[in-house]
Amino acid sequence: VGWGWKETADAGLDIVSYTGNGSNPRNISHNLSAIPHWILIMDRDQGVDRFNYHQAIGNTHTLLLNATNPKIDSDVWNDTTPTSSVFTLGTNDVNANNVKYMAYVWTEKKGFSKFGSYKGNGNIDGPMIYTGFRPAWIMIRNTGATENWVLFDAKRDVFNEMSAILRADSAAAEGNQPDSYAIDFLSNGFKIREDDGKINSSNVEYVFMCFAESPFVNSNGLPVNAR
């Protein structure tokens, strides 16, 4: 299965290409006209670590999309929260001289996308997370332990409980263990149905990125028409 995102401020995505200059801190402009909630930066020349800013873990930490490390205390974001016009780089990990980078910059759009967090309860009756829409695609990450990034979508798994996962940090084939990491896609969010560490360890913070299949409300907060 393939996924794609169209760059448009209306959908909350700006793609920014820049060349590092080795001078930190450095501000990089974006065109969202809104505060970013998720930023992914990739080195286009060397293909090394892929750094994530997520609003739930803040500007003092990062997560690596290509690795299973827990969140890292880092100066990558210069301990500076992004604004509606710029995000700030703090180290040569994302601003090495003459290295080309690509930054994917997202902001939440009501009824279309949600970038949040939840706390696991270690129970098969796990937390329910409100998004305001039925998900089409969800990526979840345990921030406090060595675990995979796990992706669920409504194309490979069409009925609840959903347990077919791909791992963003691994080239391994699809996993499917309904007794370990199942979730339900709901009309207004998703519910955790198992207690595996990838999605639901007790008292652990998880971050998620979620995009809509069917909005529960439109961008103005009004209920949408039934299909």
Give the ranges of each region predicted by the language model.
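Surface-exposed molecular-recognition determinants
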Residues: 1-227
